[in-house]
Amino acid sequence: MTIDETKKKKMLSYRWLVFIALAIAYFFVYFHRTTGGAISTTLMDYFGVGTASVALLASAYLYAYTLMQIPSGILTDRMGPRKAATIFVALIAVGSLLSAYSATANDFNLMIAGKFIIGIGAAVVYIPIMKVLAVWFRKNEFATMSGILLLVGNVGGIAAATPMVLMMDALGIEMTYIVLAIITALIALLVWLLVRNHPMEKDLPSIEEIVSEETGQPITESTSEKMGTVEALKRTFLSGRNFWPLAIWFFVMYGTIMLWQASQAGAYYKNIGGFDAGTAGMMLTMVGVGMVFGCPLAGKLSDSYLHSRKKVVIIGTVVYTLIWAFIYLTADSADILTNEMIQYVINFCFGFFGGFFVVSYAQIKELYPIAMAGTSTAALNLFPFAGGAILITIAGFLVTDQTLDQYKTVWLMALGLMVLGCICAFLSKEKEHDA
């Protein structure tokens, strides 16, 4: 079958509008995920609460996000990415409004409730985007596009630091969250207007039809196929090496990233390294900057050069593990720990190679039928956030007096877990790609 060239060009152009609308939404997913640390002092002063309450606020988002991972996959496969993303981006706006009202009522519990609602909404954004990438983009573009998406997300994470603090200083807590609610509501409208579940909804050829014409190969799988929820879950969780090595790997990989970036590193630099809060914050910003470069590069390496998901995952995991070894082994060295340049480089490399995790989404997607792309990706995505929640909780019990020995115990735990992560990366499976 010959494809109309005009429709083909329109499809290959329109998909970028779909991606841009969803990427803007994902910017704010990352923004809300990482904003707590930067404004923690402001919140403590305004509401009269302590560090434990602020930690609870951060974990409210995390636990909501984790709990919604499997439902997000089911909702995406059943409702379609367009409706699922629109509804739950709008829910982020609702959570932002509740956060604004918490400042008016001077009720920190309402702020926590607002953060929890934001977490629920944010959880059902990433999986619809993964489904859209699977339907609108070629298979050899998936990892690259995932990397670009994570780049956008990490820019959102960077914006959640100093820019958020400046905005809150200028507008106050209430008006800041009202502005965020309005922006998010407009983004939900943009998603509804631009996103389509499948090219056929705009009378355009599917990506598999385009690829078939380009390669001369017959279509073996349709992006319009659907599968029952129970069947998709069974095929995911009972698939042995297709799923579990990657799941365990992601648990420890992203769990240790969050352990460092979102929990212990700031206090470690302040209490052991002797840095002020501003300098420590700038050092940790380099983790996000590293990911801005590492995520898209990993995707490009996977799609265009190494033609392998697994090799890229292994490279990133091994180097990331070596960075943890460096952190642990040099913790006793005051000359290294107090050297700002070394710590900036370490945090950049930490984020750069840690960001190679993005390729795992392409790896898992290709091991299952396209009809269960949402469910299989959501099942995998359950583990990194569970890893972060659990490891941060464990670290909280281990670091009670904030002594060097206690931090070293946590770093050793992270290093040991990453050795396990390396083993799992080597044991993981991938679909073979043509060079």
Where would I find each of the regions flagged by the language model?
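Conserved MFS/SLC helix-loop-helix module at the cytosolic interface between two early adjacent transmembrane helices
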Residues: 67-108
